[in-house]
Each structure stands twice: as C-alpha cells, then as structure tokens.
C-alpha cells in the first residue's frame, strides 16, 4: 500500500513474512471476512483468543459480530489451552532472548542505583532508566515503577524529590525487538546506607527471595513455594515484634497478607505477565491447583501450578507497610490475634521493599 510506504517506509509483505516461517496461505482483511462469513453460514466453530488490544476487539466485532463485552467469554478454551501449553515451556532460543532482555534490565537497574541521590526527582531517574532500554534497541516491558513509596505496588515516578533516609523501589524491565521481556525489582536507600530498621526488613525479604530460588524445582507446585515463603516471612515478623501467634494458623487465616498482599510470582515470556489476557486461572493454574479467590492477598496469586523444566517465572517477595490497610484491619479487628497493631503503627512511614528476579 503506497500510503503505508509514504508514512512508514517499505516493509516486507504479509505473504513474504508468512512464507519465511512456513505459513502457506495468507489473505487480506477482505478475504478473511469472506472466510469468516462462510464459516458462520456453515455453523463452524471459529477459534480465537481473548483479545487484549482495542483495535483487535473491533476487528473481531466486524468479522464475527461478537460485541467486545462478550468476546472474553466467547473465546476458544481449546485454543487457549493449546497456546498456554505451547508458550509455557520456553525453547533454548527463547531462553537466549530472555537472557538478552535480562542483560538490558540489569543496565536499567544499575543506572537507577547510580543516579538515585538526594535532591534528584523520581521522574528524572525513571526517565533515565527508560532511556537505557531504548538505547540498547529495546523498549520498556511495562511502565517503569520508581518511587519512594514502595508500599504502593505500582508507584509510578512523580516529581517528588528523593530524600536522604528513605528507600527507593525500582521495578523495571526491558522488552527486546522480538518482544521477550525482563522484570526485576530492587530496593535501596537513597543515601546509600540502610538504617537498622530498613536493614532488618531487607534481610527478611532477601531470605524469602533466596529460599524461593532454592525451593523452586521441576515438579514442585509454585503455590507451595509461595506459602513456604509466607511462613518464613511471618516467623521473621514475629521475631521483630510485628506479629504473634502460631505461624501455621496465621498463614491459613491470611494474616501474612498484611505484609505480602500479592503472590510470589508470575509467568514470563513475550508478555511481562505472560499470556495474562488469557486469564491467570488458565495460565498459572490447572485442575490440580486452583487459587483461593476469597482470601485477601492469596487471591492475587498468579502462579500456582507444578513447575516444569523450561518454565520462566518471577520470584518477587516483598514486605509492605500500607497505612490504610493497617488502619482497616485494626478497625475490623481482622487477624488481631496474629498482628501487633501498636508496633505496626510505628512502621507507617516505612514504605516497602521488594526483590524480584526472573
């Protein structure tokens, strides 16, 4: 199309690109419309995946007459399961591409550590981190999180000035030209030196992070790894005077979610939350492992199924002190037998710490 060439330059045709990867037949959108109309007339099953992009939702509406609000429930479960099976186990070539993304991600994070100084804005550091991704021929895998408010899970950079004595949390990753992603988080003191209180919490998160790496083996349910980490975390919170009671009972009641209100990790690949548009219950779980959607924190567990060789998952424990959550649980006396609210009040200005690797 000459208009496309004028605006975007010459590109390979769909036919040429398809032939290069072994696809025998291609057509334009008009031809696809005819194919779909014939299939609908013959009452054939048309398989499609849950769309993520708005323009694809419009195309499905034009092709199949399915309203965007009904497309997720109309998507093919057979195709979803087939694609999840195919994409869950990464090939050596995919692992190599993920490693390439990880190398760029490392440069992004070390840049943040170098530039984060008292007097610099969060926006400045976040912008430089993004620039590193672009300068190495990639893009950011997701909007970079860089904030002194680590207790906010997705705290985007603001014009707030970095202050001595506070912690900065950086959650960032690169997406390569072939669309494979990295996703790492580091938390560090703005002035380069932890206070004792910060170091105490950091060491707990680090212990949980390292334990997850040790426990995560082929054949192990990732949900079991998650809850093993929750037990370690709660034991350490008891040692610091922030929690109390029987650890097994506390974790069963969900008391650990005061500190860790999310799951241990998620699948990685061509999406930073790989295949998330298929619904995490279809990606991170199976008939053997089902999430508890009723319990706060546990309902955010994205990955619970048995690990297989070739899976790529994140390991991202954290400890967060969220003032609104502390106040709400205190008012409701939720898990009061397991939490020391007076001590928790002393940590309302702490923020949060997360450590994440793929």
Regions found by a protein language model. Name each.
Residues 1-358:
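Active-site neighborhoods and metal-handling regions in enzymes and metal-associated proteins
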């Amino acid at each position: 199309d000459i208009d496309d060439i004028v605006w975007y330059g010459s590109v390979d045709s769909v036919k040429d690109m398809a032939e290069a990867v072994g696809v025998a037949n291609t057509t334009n959108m008009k031809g696809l419309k005819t194919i779909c109309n014939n299939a609908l007339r013959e009452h054939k099953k048309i398989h499609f995946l849950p769309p993520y992009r708005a323009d694809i939702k419009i195309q499905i509406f034009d092709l199949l007459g399915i309203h965007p609000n009904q497309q997720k429930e109309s998507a093919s479960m057979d195709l979803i399961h087939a694609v999840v099976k195919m994409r869950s186990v990464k090939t050596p070539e995919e692992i190599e591409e993920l490693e390439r993304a990880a190398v760029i991600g490392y440069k992004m994070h070390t840049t943040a550590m170098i530039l984060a100084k008292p007097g610099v804005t969060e926006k400045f550091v976040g912008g430089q981190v993004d620039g590193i991704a672009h300068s190495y021929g990639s893009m950011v895998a997701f909007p970079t999180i860089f904030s002194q408010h680590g207790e906010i899970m997705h705290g985007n950079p603001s014009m707030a000035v970095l202050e001595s004595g506070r912690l900065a949390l950086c959650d960032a990753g690169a997406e390569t030209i072939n669309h494979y992603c990295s996703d790492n988080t580091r938390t560090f003191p703005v002035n380069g030196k932890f206070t004792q209180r910060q170091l105490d919490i950091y060491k707990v998160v680090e212990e949980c992070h390292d334990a997850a790496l040790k426990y995560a083996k082929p054949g192990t349910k990732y949900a079991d790894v998650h809850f093993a980490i929750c037990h370690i975390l709660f034991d350490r919170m008891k040692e610091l005077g922030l929690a109390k009671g029987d650890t097994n009972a506390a974790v069963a009641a969900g008391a650990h979610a005061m500190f860790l209100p999310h799951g241990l990790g998620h699948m990685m690949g061509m999406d930073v939350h790989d295949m998330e548009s298929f619904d995490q219950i279809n990606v991170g779980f199976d008939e053997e492992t089902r999430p508890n959607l009723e319990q706060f924190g546990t309902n955010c567990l994205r990955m619970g199924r048995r690990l297989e060789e070739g899976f790529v998952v994140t390991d991202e424990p954290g400890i967060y002190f969220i003032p609104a959550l502390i106040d709400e649980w205190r008012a409701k006396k939720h898990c009061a037998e397991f939490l020391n609210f007076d001590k928790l009040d002393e940590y309302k200005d702490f923020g949060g710490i997360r450590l994440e690797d793929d």
